[in-house]
Amino acid sequence: MLRFLNQCSQGRGAWLLMAFTALALELTALWFQHVMLLKPCVLCIYERCALFGVLGAALIGAIAPKTPLRYVAMVIWLYSAFRGVQLTYEHTMLQLYPSPFATCDFMVRFPEWLPLDKWVPQVFVASGDCAERQWDFLGMEMPQWLLGIFIAYLIVAVLVVISQPFKAKKRDLFGR
């Protein structure tokens, strides 16, 4: 299995599949926001940023999968998936155990050199409350679904990193 994951990490297909899944999730979030009129909270926006990190890592990996640049993509992938797990866990706890003392920020805080909320307000401005339950599917809220998704991204990322020393076996039918 590790040899297979190593081989997949050196091809564009797996990276493009990851980019497709992350892009599909981002488009779904925008659909929830602009079509279903659900208000994203601050943690939702941060989770969206973590998902953009996974998307960016996938695109970097797809650009040059056989070069050392794929290791940069793996680091970004690991970091983004880990931060996504942290953020969605915090968000899930806020929704499952609401408290007037445990709240999220009132507005998104981006660095001054990257004010995404001012550049693309349709995507990065938060207007909802983190503790409010707006949507559920099969008995789970949106942060709980995202927690499972980010855990899956993280597990696969760890396995791909572990698989890097395991090179694919050369198949030689004639024993040359």
UniProtKB/Swiss-Prot annotation:
Subcellular location: Cell inner membrane
Stretches in topological domain Periplasmic: 32-49, 90-144
One of the protein's GO biological processes: protein folding
SUPFAM superfamilies with a match to the protein in the record: DsbB-like (SSF158442)
InterPro entries cross-referenced by the UniProt entry: DiS_bond_form_DsbB/BdbC, Disulphide_bond_form_DsbB, DsbB, DsbB-like_sf
UniProt keywords, alphabetically: Cell inner membrane, Cell membrane, Chaperone, Disulfide bond, Electron transport, Membrane, Oxidoreductase, Redox-active center, Transmembrane, Transmembrane helix, Transport
Single annotated GO MF: protein-disulfide reductase activity
Cysteines paired by S-S bonds: 41-44, 104-130
Residues that span the membrane, as ranges: 15-31, 50-65, 72-89, 145-163
Cellular component aspect of the GO annotation: plasma membrane
Domain of life from the UniProt record: Bacteria
Cytoplasmic side: 1-14, 66-71, 164-176
Topology of the protein relative to the lipid bilayer: Multi-pass membrane protein
Main localisation: membrane
Function recorded in the entry: Required for disulfide bond formation in some periplasmic proteins such as PhoA or OmpA. Acts by oxidizing the DsbA protein.
Family in the record: Belongs to the DsbB family.
Designated name of the protein: Disulfide bond formation protein B
